[in-house]
């Protein structure tokens, strides 16, 4: 396949005697932890997080808020059950646990966080406190 991309493994052919140095002990590019990308944007009303989680059901994803204003998004992609007669030619889809944590700013309304999942995209909305403009009162100057 001319459009396929195989990542070169510089350690593949080295006869390491210490298993701690083997290539399999290094983090893999396709691990779920690495591939869980999350966007964070701030609108005038809220902080909005979007995560692409293809193939996951909402029951497989956890959204949690910790006391110190930390938003945690975690879950697990399960490995496909393997039949002994199956021969795999390529495994590119990631599996395993993932977790991402974000410290929210002071203006986050921690008690009003909402999460929704649609078509494999998780959206977490954290409303912001309204910035109160100082009330200015004119004082009349007497003579």
Swiss-Prot record:
PROSITE patterns: SHSP. GO terms for cellular component: cytoplasm. It holds the Pfam family HSP20. Keywords: Cytoplasm, Stress response. Transmembrane segments: none annotated. InterPro entries: A-crystallin/Hsp20_dom (IPR002068), HSP20-like_chaperone (IPR008978), Small_HSP (IPR031107). This is 18.1 kDa class I heat shock protein. The lineage of its organism: Eukaryota, Viridiplantae, Streptophyta, Embryophyta, Tracheophyta.
